[in-house]
């Protein structure tokens, strides 16, 4: 079972330790230090976070490889199950417009991202108006969120159903 605490030592390690896993703009793999994370649409401040992007063909710290690979595989299976449920409950006239059945869209895909987010403690030195994660809309086929390591701190805004 994946626990963020397994990754916490990586994120709280000195910057020099993390640099060898530095985020690569072309591959989207690796550690994105503070100041690199994106700015949410409609916001002019970067999110106050670090993250590590992991893909099945990517790399991560050796000590974290087994649990990260396992978590990636488990989340992939959850996503596949969710997509099958969505497919099964989608009206036929909409299903006919899909290029593939939804679960097949993620089979053998090299584009499935597992992002491990880290939100450092607030120091009081942050730019006014900066947030850990500003309101945003994910642009993925599906986003699977795990429970946060701090109970009750993950906020998800529900939008009206279509």
Question: What is the predicted function of each stretch?
Answer:
Residues 1-162:
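Peripheral, non-catalytic segments flanking oxidoreductase cores
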């Amino acid at each position: 079972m994946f626990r963020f605490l397994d990754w916490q030592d990586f994120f709280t390690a000195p910057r020099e330790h993390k640099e060898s896993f530095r985020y690569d703009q072309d591959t989207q793999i690796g550690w994105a230090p503070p100041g690199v994370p994106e700015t949410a649409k409609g916001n002019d401040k970067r999110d106050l976070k670090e993250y590590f992007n992991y893909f099945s063909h990517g790399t991560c710290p050796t000590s974290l490889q087994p649990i990260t690979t396992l978590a990636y595989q488990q989340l992939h299976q959850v996503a596949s199950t969710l997509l099958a449920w969505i497919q099964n409950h989608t009206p036929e006239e909409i299903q006919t417009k899909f290029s593939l059945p939804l679960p097949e869209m993620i089979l053998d895909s090299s584009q499935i991202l597992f992002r491990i987010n880290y939100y450092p403690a607030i120091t009081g030195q942050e730019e006014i108006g900066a947030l850990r994660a500003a309101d945003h809309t994910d642009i993925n086929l599906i986003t699977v969120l795990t429970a946060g390591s701090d109970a009750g701190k993950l906020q998800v805004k529900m939008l009206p159903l279509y």
